[in-house]
Amino acid sequence: MYTRIFIRRYAPGCNSISPSSAVSCRRRFHNVIVDVALGIDVYHFMFAKTDTVVLPDGEEEKTMDVMMKIIDKALELGLDRKVTFVALGGGVIGDMVGFAAAIYQRGVNFIQIPTTVMAMVDSSVGGKTGVNHPLGKNMVGAFHQPQCVFIDTNTLSTLPDRELQSGIAEVIKYGLIRDADFFEWQEKNMANLLARDSATLRYAIKRSCENKAEVVKADEKEAGVRATLNLGHTFGHAIENGSGYGVWLHGEAVAIGTVMATNMSARMGWIDQGLVKRIYDIMDAAKLPVELPLDSPMNAETFLKVMSVDKKVANGQLRLILLKGKLGNCLFTGDFDEQAMKDTIDEFVAECSGAGKVAA
C-alpha cells in the first residue's frame, strides 16, 4: 500500500489543518473521528462535523488504557468499518490512533496530521503503530498504513524549542545511515533549522520523508533494511524506559543512543575518529544531549535488561544498528564485539548516580 504525503505551509495564523481539507476528508469517508493531543485547537474540525477524542500526550501516556479511549468512543457512537480516524498531534498521538485504527473492527482507515518535527519526519510515515509496555517501548502494536499524511509546517511555529530539537535527532539519523549529502546539508543549515526558517524546515521534512519512504517501500514489515532506521534506538529506548517514560523526549534519548552506537562502532574500528567528531559536533549544533546527566538513574544492569527485550532481538541474540565505513553507511547485525558494547555502556553510566559496571 502507498501513502500520499502532502507537505505545505498553510495560511499564517492557522494552527491546524485548513477547514477545506478537513471537509474534504469528510466527503471522502463515511465518518470521521478526530483524536487530538491535549491543548491543540480543534476549531477547524467543527466544519467537518467530526467527533473528537482529546488524549493526553507524552510517552508516559502511550498506554493501552489511553488508546482504548478511542475504541470506547467509536463503539459509543456506533461507528462502522467505514469510519476514518484522524490523528492530530505528535508521534505519541499518531502511534495510538494508528493502533486503534488497526484493531477497531479488524482495521479501519486513518489519516495522520502530525504537528511536531518528530512526527513529520518519522513516526507519521511508514505505518508503525502501537503503545508502550512497562517492560519495553512499543512492544504492543501493528503495522497499519495511513491513507494519507497532511504535513502543515505552520503548526511548528508554536512548537517548544526542546520538541523541535528532539525531532531533529531523527533528521540527523537519515544522513548517518544512508544519505551523506543530506548530513552535509544539515551541517551547513542547522542554525536555520533551529531558527525555524520555513524553506529549510520544508526541505528537511521532505528529504527525511523521501528517505523513509524508500526504506519502507523496500521492507514494510521490518524484516531487514527497515531496521536500520532504528540507529540509536536500542540504547535510546533503554534510556527512556530505565529513566521513566516522560523524563526524556524520544529524540533526546535517540541522540544519546546514536552517540553510544557511534562510540561502540569506533571501539571496534568500524569508523574513524573524524566521523565521530562530526557526529558529536552536529548533535551539539542541534542542542541535543550526548551524555547522561549526573543524576541519571541508569546503570549497566538496566541497560542490558531493557535491551534484552528489544524488538530486534532474534533467537535470543541482540541485534544493533551500527555505523561502518564512510558517512552514510550502517549495518544491522548481531555479529559484534559484546565487550565493546559493555565498555560503551560502562563509559556512559560511569558518572551517573546509578553507576554499576557490566561484568566482563
Residue ranges of model-derived segments:
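ATP/NTP phosphate-donor binding region
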Residues: 1-84
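Active-site segments that bind and position negatively charged phosphate/pyrophosphate groups
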Residues: 184, 188-301
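Short glycine/serine/threonine-rich phosphate/pyrophosphate-binding segments
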Residues: 92-99, 120, 237-238
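Residue-level signal for inorganic ion chemistry
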Residues: 63, 114, 152, 258, ...
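A glycine/threonine-rich phosphate-anchoring loop and its flanking beta-alpha core
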Residues: 99-192
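Glycine-rich beta-strand-to-loop/alpha-helix junction loops that act as flexible
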Residues: 57-58, 88-90, 231-232
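C-terminal charged capping/lid subdomain of soluble metabolic enzymes
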Residues: 169-171, 270-360
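Alpha-helix C-terminal capping segments
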Residues: 96-107, 242-243, 263
